[in-house]
Amino acid sequence: MRSFLKPLLTIAAMALGMAAVVPMPAWALVELNVNKGNVEPLPIAITDFQGGDALGAQISQIVTADLKRSGLFAPIDKSAFIEKITNPDAAPRFDDWKVINAQALVTGSVSKEADGRIRAQYRLWDTFAGQQMAGEQFFANDANQRRVAHIIADAIYERLTGEKGYFDTRVVFIDESGAKNARKKRLAIMDQDGANVRYLSDGRSIVLTPRFSPNRQEITYMSYESGQPRVYLLQIETGQRELVGNFPGMTFAPRFSPDGQKVIMSLLRDDGNSNIFAMDLRSRSTTRLTNSTAIDTSPSYSPDGSKVVFTSDRGGRAQIYVMGADGSGQTRISFGDGVYSTPVWSPRGDLIAFTKQTGGEFQIGVMKTDGSGERILSSGFQQEGPTWAPNGRVLMFFRDSNGGPKLVSVDLTGRNEQPIPTSNFASDPAWSPLLE
Amino acid sequence: MGRIAALTRNPVMIALVAMLAIAGCASKKTPNNAADLGLNGAGAATPGSAQDFTVNIGDRIFFDTDSSSIRADAQTTLARQAQWLNQYKQYAIVVEGHADERGTREYNLALGARRAAAARDFLVSKGVASSRLKTISYGKERPVAVCDDISCWSQNRRAVTTLSGAGS
Protein backbone atom coordinates (compact mmCIF):
# COMPACT_ATOMS: atom_id res chain seq x y z
CA MET A 1 0.00 0.00 0.00
CA ARG A 2 1.52 3.30 -1.03
CA SER A 3 1.12 6.19 1.28
CA PHE A 4 1.46 9.91 1.39
CA LEU A 5 3.24 10.14 4.71
CA LYS A 6 5.08 7.36 6.44
CA PRO A 7 2.88 7.29 9.56
CA LEU A 8 -0.15 6.77 7.35
CA LEU A 9 1.01 3.31 6.40
CA THR A 10 -0.89 1.93 9.30
CA ILE A 11 -4.30 2.87 7.98
CA ALA A 12 -6.04 -0.34 7.12
CA ALA A 13 -9.62 -0.96 6.23
CA MET A 14 -11.87 -3.98 6.31
CA ALA A 15 -15.53 -4.40 5.64
CA LEU A 16 -17.83 -4.96 8.55
CA GLY A 17 -20.38 -7.72 8.33
CA MET A 18 -23.87 -6.60 7.51
CA ALA A 19 -26.17 -6.37 10.46
CA ALA A 20 -29.09 -7.01 8.12
CA VAL A 21 -29.11 -10.08 5.92
CA VAL A 22 -31.06 -8.50 3.07
CA PRO A 23 -28.80 -8.07 0.02
CA MET A 24 -27.83 -4.46 -0.43
CA PRO A 25 -29.39 -2.76 -3.45
CA ALA A 26 -26.83 -0.86 -5.53
CA TRP A 27 -28.73 2.36 -5.91
CA ALA A 28 -27.59 5.74 -4.71
CA LEU A 29 -29.69 7.92 -2.45
CA VAL A 30 -28.22 11.12 -3.88
CA GLU A 31 -28.31 11.87 -7.56
CA LEU A 32 -25.46 13.98 -8.91
CA ASN A 33 -26.65 16.01 -11.84
CA VAL A 34 -25.12 19.40 -12.44
CA ASN A 35 -27.73 20.28 -15.03
CA LYS A 36 -30.64 19.78 -12.65
CA GLY A 37 -32.09 22.79 -10.92
CA ASN A 38 -31.87 22.70 -7.17
CA VAL A 39 -30.18 19.64 -5.77
CA GLU A 40 -32.00 18.88 -2.55
CA PRO A 41 -29.37 17.87 0.02
CA LEU A 42 -30.01 14.49 1.60
CA PRO A 43 -31.00 14.71 5.29
CA ILE A 44 -28.54 12.52 7.17
CA ALA A 45 -28.07 11.86 10.90
CA ILE A 46 -24.48 11.41 12.01
CA THR A 47 -24.28 10.26 15.61
CA ASP A 48 -21.27 10.71 17.85
CA PHE A 49 -18.96 7.74 17.54
CA GLN A 50 -18.97 5.72 20.76
CA GLY A 51 -15.88 5.54 22.94
CA GLY A 52 -12.47 7.17 22.63
CA ASP A 53 -13.46 10.00 25.00
CA ALA A 54 -13.62 13.18 22.95
CA LEU A 55 -12.30 11.43 19.86
CA GLY A 56 -15.63 9.80 19.03
CA ALA A 57 -17.38 13.15 18.92
CA GLN A 58 -14.50 14.69 16.99
CA ILE A 59 -14.64 12.05 14.26
CA SER A 60 -18.36 12.55 13.96
CA GLN A 61 -17.80 16.31 13.73
CA ILE A 62 -15.26 15.99 10.90
CA VAL A 63 -17.47 13.58 8.95
CA THR A 64 -20.41 15.96 9.42
CA ALA A 65 -18.40 18.99 8.24
CA ASP A 66 -17.08 17.19 5.15
CA LEU A 67 -20.51 15.96 4.07
CA LYS A 68 -22.17 19.31 4.77
CA ARG A 69 -19.59 21.27 2.78
CA SER A 70 -20.18 19.04 -0.24
CA GLY A 71 -23.63 20.59 -0.51
CA LEU A 72 -25.15 17.17 -1.17
CA PHE A 73 -26.02 16.37 2.42
CA ALA A 74 -27.95 18.16 5.13
CA PRO A 75 -26.72 16.80 8.46
CA ILE A 76 -29.50 16.93 11.05
CA ASP A 77 -28.89 18.81 14.28
CA LYS A 78 -28.04 16.37 17.06
CA SER A 79 -30.55 17.97 19.40
CA ALA A 80 -33.31 16.56 17.20
CA PHE A 81 -32.14 12.96 17.65
CA ILE A 82 -34.63 10.76 19.54
CA GLU A 83 -32.75 7.48 19.87
CA LYS A 84 -29.54 7.59 21.84
CA ILE A 85 -27.24 5.05 20.19
CA THR A 86 -25.57 2.88 22.78
CA ASN A 87 -24.56 -0.06 20.61
CA PRO A 88 -23.39 1.14 17.17
CA ASP A 89 -23.30 -2.45 15.90
CA ALA A 90 -26.96 -3.14 16.55
CA ALA A 91 -29.76 -2.11 14.23
CA PRO A 92 -31.13 1.27 15.31
CA ARG A 93 -34.81 1.99 15.92
CA PHE A 94 -35.47 3.07 12.33
CA ASP A 95 -38.80 4.72 13.20
CA ASP A 96 -37.02 7.14 15.55
CA TRP A 97 -34.87 8.31 12.63
CA LYS A 98 -37.60 8.34 10.01
CA VAL A 99 -39.69 10.64 12.16
CA ILE A 100 -36.96 13.28 12.10
CA ASN A 101 -36.62 12.67 8.34
CA ALA A 102 -33.13 11.20 8.50
CA GLN A 103 -32.90 9.29 5.23
CA ALA A 104 -29.52 7.92 6.20
CA LEU A 105 -27.98 7.30 9.60
CA VAL A 106 -24.32 6.93 10.54
CA THR A 107 -23.29 5.13 13.71
CA GLY A 108 -19.80 4.20 14.76
CA SER A 109 -17.28 3.59 17.45
CA VAL A 110 -13.67 4.28 18.15
CA SER A 111 -11.29 2.55 20.54
CA LYS A 112 -7.62 2.23 21.39
CA GLU A 113 -5.92 -1.04 20.54
CA ALA A 114 -3.33 -2.62 22.81
CA ASP A 115 -0.59 -1.56 20.37
CA GLY A 116 -1.63 2.11 20.66
CA ARG A 117 -3.43 2.28 17.34
CA ILE A 118 -6.93 3.64 16.99
CA ARG A 119 -9.68 1.40 15.74
CA ALA A 120 -12.59 3.25 14.17
CA GLN A 121 -15.62 1.70 12.61
CA TYR A 122 -18.79 3.02 11.11
CA ARG A 123 -22.09 1.72 9.82
CA LEU A 124 -24.31 3.50 7.35
CA TRP A 125 -28.03 2.75 7.60
CA ASP A 126 -30.85 3.32 5.17
CA THR A 127 -33.59 4.27 7.60
CA PHE A 128 -36.52 3.96 5.19
CA ALA A 129 -35.44 0.57 3.83
CA GLY A 130 -34.54 -0.43 7.38
CA GLN A 131 -31.17 -1.93 6.58
CA GLN A 132 -27.43 -1.39 6.70
CA MET A 133 -25.92 0.03 3.50
CA ALA A 134 -22.25 -0.10 4.39
CA GLY A 135 -19.86 -0.77 7.24
CA GLU A 136 -16.10 -0.73 7.55
CA GLN A 137 -13.42 -0.46 10.17
CA PHE A 138 -10.05 1.24 10.07
CA PHE A 139 -6.87 1.11 12.09
CA ALA A 140 -4.62 4.13 12.28
CA ASN A 141 -2.05 5.71 14.54
CA ASP A 142 -2.78 8.84 16.56
CA ALA A 143 -1.41 11.24 13.95
CA ASN A 144 -4.08 10.11 11.50
CA GLN A 145 -7.21 10.71 13.52
CA ARG A 146 -8.49 13.30 11.10
CA ARG A 147 -7.64 11.14 8.11
CA VAL A 148 -9.76 8.31 9.49
CA ALA A 149 -12.71 10.69 9.67
CA HIS A 150 -12.13 11.89 6.10
CA ILE A 151 -11.88 8.29 4.85
CA ILE A 152 -15.20 7.48 6.54
CA ALA A 153 -16.76 10.60 4.98
CA ASP A 154 -15.46 9.49 1.57
CA ALA A 155 -16.95 6.03 2.05
CA ILE A 156 -20.35 7.48 2.97
CA TYR A 157 -20.23 9.96 0.07
CA GLU A 158 -19.37 7.17 -2.36
CA ARG A 159 -22.04 4.82 -1.08
CA LEU A 160 -24.75 7.46 -1.23
CA THR A 161 -23.82 9.21 -4.49
CA GLY A 162 -22.17 6.47 -6.52
CA GLU A 163 -19.13 8.71 -7.03
CA LYS A 164 -15.72 8.69 -5.38
CA GLY A 165 -15.30 11.19 -2.54
CA TYR A 166 -12.56 13.79 -2.20
CA PHE A 167 -12.22 14.40 1.54
CA ASP A 168 -9.07 12.38 2.23
CA THR A 169 -6.96 14.79 0.18
CA ARG A 170 -4.54 17.64 0.67
CA VAL A 171 -4.03 21.02 -0.89
CA VAL A 172 -0.72 22.76 -1.60
CA PHE A 173 -0.99 26.50 -1.80
CA ILE A 174 0.84 29.79 -1.33
CA ASP A 175 0.49 31.25 2.16
CA GLU A 176 0.62 35.03 1.90
CA SER A 177 1.26 37.48 4.72
CA GLY A 178 2.30 41.10 5.06
CA ALA A 179 1.44 44.24 3.13
CA LYS A 180 0.39 43.98 -0.49
CA ASN A 181 3.55 45.68 -1.74
CA ALA A 182 5.82 43.53 0.45
CA ARG A 183 3.96 40.23 0.51
CA LYS A 184 5.71 37.24 2.02
CA LYS A 185 4.86 34.10 0.08
CA ARG A 186 5.43 30.63 1.46
CA LEU A 187 4.72 27.19 0.09
CA ALA A 188 2.30 25.41 2.37
CA ILE A 189 0.32 22.18 2.50
CA MET A 190 -2.84 21.35 4.44
CA ASP A 191 -5.77 18.95 4.53
CA GLN A 192 -8.57 19.89 2.11
CA ASP A 193 -10.63 21.28 5.01
CA GLY A 194 -7.86 23.65 6.12
CA ALA A 195 -6.50 21.54 9.00
CA ASN A 196 -2.88 20.47 9.59
CA VAL A 197 -1.11 23.34 7.82
CA ARG A 198 2.59 22.76 7.27
CA TYR A 199 5.05 25.16 5.65
CA LEU A 200 7.40 23.96 2.94
CA SER A 201 9.41 27.14 2.35
CA ASP A 202 10.68 29.94 4.56
CA GLY A 203 9.28 32.93 2.70
CA ARG A 204 12.62 34.48 1.80
CA SER A 205 11.96 34.20 -1.93
CA ILE A 206 8.79 34.53 -3.94
CA VAL A 207 7.27 31.12 -4.64
CA LEU A 208 4.28 30.58 -6.92
CA THR A 209 2.01 28.01 -8.56
CA PRO A 210 2.68 24.74 -6.69
CA ARG A 211 1.19 21.64 -8.39
CA PHE A 212 0.84 18.08 -7.09
CA SER A 213 2.49 15.09 -8.64
CA PRO A 214 0.08 12.22 -9.31
CA ASN A 215 2.18 10.17 -6.84
CA ARG A 216 1.31 12.73 -4.11
CA GLN A 217 4.93 12.80 -2.92
CA GLU A 218 6.26 15.70 -4.95
CA ILE A 219 5.23 19.13 -6.01
CA THR A 220 6.49 21.30 -8.84
CA TYR A 221 6.47 25.05 -8.36
CA MET A 222 8.17 28.27 -9.38
CA SER A 223 10.64 30.13 -7.18
CA TYR A 224 12.80 33.24 -7.39
CA GLU A 225 15.39 31.81 -5.00
CA SER A 226 18.24 31.84 -7.53
CA GLY A 227 17.40 35.37 -8.63
CA GLN A 228 16.04 34.19 -11.95
CA PRO A 229 12.53 32.72 -11.64
CA ARG A 230 12.61 29.00 -12.33
CA VAL A 231 10.63 25.79 -11.97
CA TYR A 232 11.64 23.38 -9.19
CA LEU A 233 10.68 19.96 -7.88
CA LEU A 234 10.22 19.40 -4.17
CA GLN A 235 9.97 16.06 -2.33
CA ILE A 236 7.36 16.88 0.30
CA GLU A 237 8.63 14.53 3.00
CA THR A 238 12.38 14.90 2.64
CA GLY A 239 12.41 18.55 1.62
CA GLN A 240 14.81 17.68 -1.19
CA ARG A 241 14.64 20.17 -4.05
CA GLU A 242 15.94 20.28 -7.58
CA LEU A 243 15.83 22.59 -10.53
CA VAL A 244 13.78 21.33 -13.48
CA GLY A 245 16.02 21.69 -16.51
CA ASN A 246 18.76 24.21 -17.08
CA PHE A 247 17.28 26.81 -19.36
CA PRO A 248 18.72 30.26 -20.02
CA GLY A 249 15.51 32.17 -19.29
CA MET A 250 12.61 32.14 -16.89
CA THR A 251 10.67 28.88 -16.60
CA PHE A 252 7.16 29.03 -15.15
CA ALA A 253 3.63 27.61 -15.09
CA PRO A 254 4.67 23.99 -14.41
CA ARG A 255 2.39 20.95 -14.17
CA PHE A 256 3.00 17.21 -14.06
CA SER A 257 1.91 14.82 -16.76
CA PRO A 258 -0.72 12.33 -15.53
CA ASP A 259 1.93 9.56 -15.31
CA GLY A 260 4.18 11.84 -13.26
CA GLN A 261 7.09 11.31 -15.65
CA LYS A 262 7.09 14.74 -17.22
CA VAL A 263 6.78 18.37 -16.23
CA ILE A 264 5.18 20.65 -18.79
CA MET A 265 5.89 24.39 -18.45
CA SER A 266 6.51 27.70 -20.15
CA LEU A 267 9.98 28.86 -21.12
CA LEU A 268 10.72 32.48 -21.85
CA ARG A 269 12.32 33.17 -25.23
CA ASP A 270 14.85 35.92 -25.73
CA ASP A 271 12.30 37.93 -27.72
CA GLY A 272 10.11 38.18 -24.63
CA ASN A 273 7.54 35.60 -25.70
CA SER A 274 6.89 32.33 -23.92
CA ASN A 275 6.57 28.85 -25.40
CA ILE A 276 5.55 25.50 -23.93
CA PHE A 277 8.03 22.70 -23.34
CA ALA A 278 7.73 19.26 -21.77
CA MET A 279 10.64 17.77 -19.88
CA ASP A 280 11.04 14.07 -19.20
CA LEU A 281 12.15 13.84 -15.57
CA ARG A 282 14.14 10.64 -16.06
CA SER A 283 15.93 11.24 -19.35
CA ARG A 284 16.01 15.04 -18.86
CA SER A 285 15.18 15.43 -22.52
CA THR A 286 12.97 18.37 -23.43
CA THR A 287 10.42 18.68 -26.18
CA ARG A 288 9.23 22.00 -27.56
CA LEU A 289 5.46 21.93 -28.04
CA THR A 290 4.74 25.46 -29.23
CA ASN A 291 6.79 27.90 -31.25
CA SER A 292 4.82 31.09 -31.61
CA THR A 293 5.70 34.76 -31.24
CA ALA A 294 3.01 34.97 -28.60
CA ILE A 295 2.50 34.16 -24.95
CA ASP A 296 1.83 30.42 -24.66
CA THR A 297 1.42 29.38 -21.03
CA SER A 298 -0.60 27.56 -18.35
CA PRO A 299 -0.40 24.11 -20.00
CA SER A 300 -2.44 21.26 -18.48
CA TYR A 301 -2.57 17.64 -19.69
CA SER A 302 -5.75 15.68 -20.31
CA PRO A 303 -5.98 12.80 -17.80
CA ASP A 304 -5.03 10.24 -20.48
CA GLY A 305 -1.94 12.29 -21.33
CA SER A 306 -2.80 12.53 -25.03
CA LYS A 307 -3.66 16.24 -25.14
CA VAL A 308 -2.65 19.55 -23.61
CA VAL A 309 -4.85 22.59 -23.01
CA PHE A 310 -3.12 25.97 -22.69
CA THR A 311 -3.47 29.75 -22.82
CA SER A 312 -2.21 31.76 -25.77
CA ASP A 313 -2.59 35.35 -26.92
CA ARG A 314 -1.56 34.47 -30.50
CA GLY A 315 -4.98 35.59 -31.67
CA GLY A 316 -4.69 39.00 -30.01
CA ARG A 317 -5.94 38.46 -26.49
CA ALA A 318 -5.56 35.42 -24.27
CA GLN A 319 -7.74 32.45 -25.26
CA ILE A 320 -7.77 28.71 -24.62
CA TYR A 321 -6.22 26.27 -27.09
CA VAL A 322 -5.92 22.48 -27.21
CA MET A 323 -3.12 20.51 -28.89
CA GLY A 324 -1.81 16.97 -29.02
CA ALA A 325 0.76 16.10 -26.37
CA ASP A 326 3.38 16.30 -29.16
CA GLY A 327 2.31 19.85 -30.05
CA SER A 328 0.28 18.83 -33.09
CA GLY A 329 -3.08 20.28 -34.12
CA GLN A 330 -3.13 23.48 -32.05
CA THR A 331 -6.75 24.60 -32.04
CA ARG A 332 -8.51 27.47 -30.34
CA ILE A 333 -11.53 26.32 -28.32
CA SER A 334 -12.69 29.45 -26.44
CA PHE A 335 -14.70 32.00 -28.36
CA GLY A 336 -16.72 33.74 -25.69
CA ASP A 337 -16.69 37.45 -25.04
CA GLY A 338 -13.67 37.99 -22.80
CA VAL A 339 -10.15 36.91 -21.98
CA TYR A 340 -9.57 33.29 -20.98
CA SER A 341 -6.66 31.84 -19.02
CA THR A 342 -5.48 29.14 -16.57
CA PRO A 343 -7.29 26.21 -18.23
CA VAL A 344 -7.19 23.00 -16.20
CA TRP A 345 -8.35 19.65 -17.50
CA SER A 346 -10.78 17.78 -15.22
CA PRO A 347 -9.48 14.50 -13.76
CA ARG A 348 -12.62 12.90 -15.25
CA GLY A 349 -11.58 14.16 -18.67
CA ASP A 350 -14.96 15.69 -19.51
CA LEU A 351 -14.47 19.38 -18.73
CA ILE A 352 -11.92 22.18 -18.74
CA ALA A 353 -12.03 24.73 -15.92
CA PHE A 354 -10.78 28.24 -16.62
CA THR A 355 -10.51 31.84 -15.45
CA LYS A 356 -12.35 34.34 -17.63
CA GLN A 357 -12.13 38.12 -17.51
CA THR A 358 -15.10 39.97 -18.84
CA GLY A 359 -16.93 43.18 -17.99
CA GLY A 360 -14.48 44.10 -15.23
CA GLU A 361 -15.04 40.76 -13.48
CA PHE A 362 -13.07 37.58 -13.05
CA GLN A 363 -15.09 34.41 -13.46
CA ILE A 364 -14.40 30.76 -12.77
CA GLY A 365 -16.09 28.50 -15.26
CA VAL A 366 -16.06 25.19 -17.08
CA MET A 367 -16.46 24.21 -20.71
CA LYS A 368 -16.46 20.93 -22.60
CA THR A 369 -13.14 19.93 -24.09
CA ASP A 370 -14.22 21.22 -27.53
CA GLY A 371 -15.06 24.61 -26.01
CA SER A 372 -18.83 24.17 -26.10
CA GLY A 373 -21.21 24.30 -23.17
CA GLU A 374 -19.49 27.07 -21.25
CA ARG A 375 -20.90 27.56 -17.75
CA ILE A 376 -19.79 30.23 -15.27
CA LEU A 377 -19.72 28.93 -11.70
CA SER A 378 -18.51 31.99 -9.84
CA SER A 379 -18.00 35.69 -10.57
CA GLY A 380 -16.12 38.29 -8.59
CA PHE A 381 -13.93 41.35 -8.72
CA GLN A 382 -10.68 39.38 -8.61
CA GLN A 383 -10.50 35.59 -8.58
CA GLU A 384 -8.55 33.01 -10.52
CA GLY A 385 -6.67 29.73 -10.64
CA PRO A 386 -9.13 26.81 -10.43
CA THR A 387 -7.96 23.35 -9.31
CA TRP A 388 -10.07 20.19 -9.45
CA ALA A 389 -11.05 17.89 -6.62
CA PRO A 390 -9.96 14.38 -7.67
CA ASN A 391 -13.56 13.35 -8.40
CA GLY A 392 -14.04 16.22 -10.85
CA ARG A 393 -17.11 17.54 -9.00
CA VAL A 394 -15.66 20.48 -7.07
CA LEU A 395 -13.22 23.28 -7.89
CA MET A 396 -11.06 25.31 -5.55
CA PHE A 397 -9.69 28.73 -6.56
CA PHE A 398 -8.55 31.96 -4.92
CA ARG A 399 -10.43 35.20 -4.56
CA ASP A 400 -8.85 38.52 -3.68
CA SER A 401 -11.05 40.67 -1.49
CA ASN A 402 -10.63 42.53 1.79
CA GLY A 403 -6.94 43.12 1.23
CA GLY A 404 -5.72 39.74 0.09
CA PRO A 405 -6.54 36.37 -1.43
CA LYS A 406 -8.43 33.53 0.27
CA LEU A 407 -9.33 30.05 -0.96
CA VAL A 408 -12.86 29.18 -2.00
CA SER A 409 -14.45 26.00 -3.31
CA VAL A 410 -17.44 25.73 -5.59
CA ASP A 411 -19.20 22.67 -6.94
CA LEU A 412 -20.19 22.14 -10.55
CA THR A 413 -23.70 23.42 -9.96
CA GLY A 414 -22.17 26.79 -8.99
CA ARG A 415 -24.64 26.94 -6.10
CA ASN A 416 -22.45 25.66 -3.32
CA GLU A 417 -19.58 28.02 -2.63
CA GLN A 418 -17.54 27.43 0.54
CA PRO A 419 -14.63 29.35 2.04
CA ILE A 420 -11.58 27.27 2.95
CA PRO A 421 -10.33 28.45 6.33
CA THR A 422 -6.67 29.58 6.39
CA SER A 423 -5.03 31.68 9.06
CA ASN A 424 -3.25 33.94 6.55
CA PHE A 425 -4.05 34.98 3.02
CA ALA A 426 -3.80 32.07 0.59
CA SER A 427 -3.55 31.66 -3.18
CA ASP A 428 -2.69 29.17 -5.95
CA PRO A 429 -4.37 26.09 -4.46
CA ALA A 430 -3.62 22.71 -6.05
CA TRP A 431 -5.67 19.72 -4.98
CA SER A 432 -4.00 16.34 -4.45
CA PRO A 433 -5.38 13.07 -5.74
CA LEU A 434 -7.09 10.91 -3.10
CA LEU A 435 -4.46 9.80 -0.60
CA GLU A 436 -3.56 6.13 -0.38
CA MET B 1 -9.47 70.01 -5.83
CA GLY B 2 -8.56 73.59 -6.65
CA ARG B 3 -4.93 72.83 -6.11
CA ILE B 4 -4.98 69.89 -8.49
CA ALA B 5 -6.72 72.01 -11.09
CA ALA B 6 -3.95 74.57 -10.72
CA LEU B 7 -1.27 71.95 -11.05
CA THR B 8 -2.70 70.51 -14.22
CA ARG B 9 -1.79 73.71 -16.00
CA ASN B 10 1.86 72.94 -15.41
CA PRO B 11 3.02 69.69 -17.03
CA VAL B 12 6.35 69.76 -15.20
CA MET B 13 4.59 69.89 -11.89
CA ILE B 14 2.35 67.01 -12.86
CA ALA B 15 5.36 64.88 -13.65
CA LEU B 16 6.92 65.71 -10.31
CA VAL B 17 3.74 65.00 -8.39
CA ALA B 18 3.31 61.71 -10.21
CA MET B 19 6.86 60.71 -9.41
CA LEU B 20 6.48 61.52 -5.74
CA ALA B 21 3.20 59.66 -5.61
CA ILE B 22 4.88 56.58 -7.01
CA ALA B 23 7.78 56.96 -4.63
CA GLY B 24 5.41 57.04 -1.70
CA CYS B 25 4.00 53.63 -2.58
CA ALA B 26 7.25 51.89 -3.36
CA SER B 27 8.59 48.88 -1.56
CA LYS B 28 11.29 49.76 0.90
CA LYS B 29 13.32 46.75 -0.12
CA THR B 30 14.16 47.89 -3.61
CA PRO B 31 15.43 51.43 -3.63
CA ASN B 32 14.71 52.51 -7.15
CA ASN B 33 13.35 55.95 -6.72
CA ALA B 34 14.02 59.17 -4.96
CA ALA B 35 12.11 58.66 -1.73
CA ASP B 36 13.65 55.27 -1.04
CA LEU B 37 17.08 56.73 -1.45
CA GLY B 38 16.38 59.41 1.10
CA LEU B 39 16.30 62.22 -1.40
CA ASN B 40 13.80 64.98 -1.43
CA GLY B 41 13.86 65.86 -5.07
CA ALA B 42 15.86 66.48 -8.17
CA GLY B 43 19.17 68.22 -8.04
CA ALA B 44 20.49 66.55 -4.90
CA ALA B 45 21.99 63.62 -6.83
CA THR B 46 25.57 63.40 -8.00
CA PRO B 47 25.70 63.19 -11.80
CA GLY B 48 26.31 59.60 -12.85
CA SER B 49 24.99 58.14 -9.60
CA ALA B 50 22.09 55.73 -9.31
CA GLN B 51 20.21 58.54 -7.60
CA ASP B 52 20.88 60.79 -10.56
CA PHE B 53 19.45 58.11 -12.87
CA THR B 54 16.33 57.56 -10.79
CA VAL B 55 15.57 61.17 -10.00
CA ASN B 56 16.72 63.11 -13.03
CA ILE B 57 16.33 60.56 -15.81
CA GLY B 58 13.40 58.45 -14.58
CA ASP B 59 13.87 54.74 -14.00
CA ARG B 60 10.47 53.48 -15.15
CA ILE B 61 8.03 53.48 -18.00
CA PHE B 62 4.36 52.56 -18.02
CA PHE B 63 2.22 50.45 -20.31
CA ASP B 64 -1.36 50.26 -21.43
CA THR B 65 -3.54 47.39 -20.19
CA ASP B 66 -2.42 43.97 -21.50
CA SER B 67 0.11 45.67 -23.79
CA SER B 68 3.86 45.64 -24.12
CA SER B 69 4.02 48.40 -26.75
CA ILE B 70 6.37 51.23 -25.81
CA ARG B 71 4.17 54.33 -25.65
CA ALA B 72 5.37 57.71 -26.91
CA ASP B 73 5.95 59.02 -23.37
CA ALA B 74 7.87 55.86 -22.56
CA GLN B 75 10.01 56.26 -25.67
CA THR B 76 11.08 59.67 -24.42
CA THR B 77 12.02 58.22 -21.03
CA LEU B 78 13.87 55.27 -22.52
CA ALA B 79 15.78 57.51 -24.95
CA ARG B 80 16.86 59.60 -21.97
CA GLN B 81 17.84 56.43 -20.10
CA ALA B 82 19.86 55.19 -23.09
CA GLN B 83 21.74 58.46 -23.37
CA TRP B 84 22.62 58.35 -19.67
CA LEU B 85 23.53 54.65 -19.74
CA ASN B 86 25.78 55.25 -22.75
CA GLN B 87 27.52 58.00 -20.81
CA TYR B 88 27.94 55.98 -17.60
CA LYS B 89 29.06 52.61 -18.86
CA GLN B 90 30.14 51.20 -15.52
CA TYR B 91 26.64 49.92 -14.75
CA ALA B 92 25.14 46.57 -15.52
CA ILE B 93 21.40 46.88 -16.02
CA VAL B 94 18.44 44.72 -15.08
CA VAL B 95 15.12 45.66 -16.62
CA GLU B 96 12.22 44.48 -14.43
CA GLY B 97 8.88 43.84 -16.08
CA HIS B 98 5.70 44.13 -14.03
CA ALA B 99 1.97 43.71 -14.58
CA ASP B 100 -1.07 45.01 -12.78
CA GLU B 101 -3.36 42.62 -10.91
CA ARG B 102 -5.99 42.51 -13.64
CA GLY B 103 -4.70 39.31 -15.16
CA THR B 104 -3.98 35.78 -13.98
CA ARG B 105 -0.71 34.99 -12.26
CA GLU B 106 0.98 32.89 -14.94
CA TYR B 107 -0.13 35.04 -17.83
CA ASN B 108 1.13 38.12 -16.01
CA LEU B 109 4.55 36.54 -15.51
CA ALA B 110 4.69 36.19 -19.29
CA LEU B 111 3.36 39.71 -19.83
CA GLY B 112 5.93 41.21 -17.43
CA ALA B 113 8.66 39.35 -19.31
CA ARG B 114 7.45 40.74 -22.60
CA ARG B 115 7.40 44.28 -21.22
CA ALA B 116 10.93 43.93 -19.86
CA ALA B 117 12.09 42.60 -23.25
CA ALA B 118 10.40 45.48 -25.09
CA ALA B 119 12.13 48.05 -22.88
CA ARG B 120 15.45 46.21 -23.22
CA ASP B 121 15.13 46.08 -27.01
CA PHE B 122 14.40 49.80 -27.12
CA LEU B 123 17.50 50.57 -25.04
CA VAL B 124 19.57 48.35 -27.35
CA SER B 125 18.18 50.17 -30.37
CA LYS B 126 19.47 53.39 -28.80
CA GLY B 127 22.97 51.99 -28.51
CA VAL B 128 23.07 50.39 -25.05
CA ALA B 129 25.19 47.22 -25.32
CA SER B 130 22.99 44.16 -25.03
CA SER B 131 25.72 42.47 -22.95
CA ARG B 132 24.98 44.96 -20.15
CA LEU B 133 21.27 44.19 -20.11
CA LYS B 134 19.34 41.46 -18.34
CA THR B 135 15.61 41.16 -17.82
CA ILE B 136 13.44 39.69 -15.10
CA SER B 137 9.68 39.45 -14.79
CA TYR B 138 7.86 39.82 -11.51
CA GLY B 139 4.42 39.44 -13.06
CA LYS B 140 1.92 40.99 -10.66
CA GLU B 141 3.85 39.90 -7.58
CA ARG B 142 5.50 43.22 -6.78
CA PRO B 143 3.00 46.03 -7.04
CA VAL B 144 4.20 49.50 -6.04
CA ALA B 145 0.71 50.89 -5.76
CA VAL B 146 -1.79 48.89 -3.74
CA CYS B 147 -5.23 50.35 -4.25
CA ASP B 148 -7.94 48.47 -6.14
CA ASP B 149 -8.53 50.86 -9.00
CA ILE B 150 -7.24 52.23 -12.25
CA SER B 151 -4.96 54.83 -10.67
CA CYS B 152 -2.93 52.07 -9.07
CA TRP B 153 -3.10 49.55 -11.88
CA SER B 154 -1.57 52.06 -14.30
CA GLN B 155 1.40 52.58 -11.97
CA ASN B 156 1.94 48.84 -11.63
CA ARG B 157 2.05 48.16 -15.39
CA ARG B 158 5.68 49.12 -15.64
CA ALA B 159 9.22 48.31 -16.65
CA VAL B 160 11.84 49.53 -14.22
CA THR B 161 15.46 49.96 -15.29
CA THR B 162 17.65 49.08 -12.32
CA LEU B 163 21.38 49.60 -12.06
CA SER B 164 23.85 47.16 -10.60
CA GLY B 165 27.54 46.37 -10.90
CA ALA B 166 30.05 49.15 -10.43
CA GLY B 167 28.38 52.26 -9.14
CA SER B 168 29.11 55.44 -7.34
Swiss-Prot record, chain B:
It is found in: Cell outer membrane. A lipid is attached at residue 25 (S-diacylglycerol cysteine). Gene3D superfamilies: OmpA-like domain. Residues 1-24 form the signal peptide. One of its GO terms (cellular component) is cell outer membrane. A lipid is attached at residue 25 (N-palmitoyl cysteine). It holds the Pfam family OmpA. Residues 50-167 form the OmpA-like domain. PROSITE patterns: OMPA_1, OMPA_2, PROKAR_LIPOPROTEIN. It is a lipid-anchor. GO terms for biological process: cell division. The keyword Amino-acid biosynthesis does not apply. Its main location: membrane. InterPro entries: Bact_OuterMem_StrucFunc, OMP_bac, OmpA-like, OMPA-like_CS, OmpA-like_sf, Pal, Pal_lipo_C. Transmembrane segments: none annotated. The keyword Cell division applies. Keywords: Cell cycle, Cell division, Cell outer membrane, Lipoprotein, Membrane, Palmitate, Signal. The Tol-Pal system is composed of five core proteins: the inner membrane proteins TolA, TolQ and TolR, the periplasmic protein TolB and the outer membrane protein Pal. They form a network linking the inner and outer membranes and the peptidoglycan layer. Belongs to the Pal lipoprotein family. Part of the Tol-Pal system, which plays a role in outer membrane invagination during cell division and is important for maintaining outer membrane integrity. This is Peptidoglycan-associated lipoprotein. It comes from Mesorhizobium japonicum (strain LMG 29417 / CECT 9101 / MAFF 303099) (Mesorhizobium loti (strain MAFF 303099)). The lineage of its organism: Bacteria, Pseudomonadati, Pseudomonadota, Alphaproteobacteria, Hyphomicrobiales. The gene is pal.
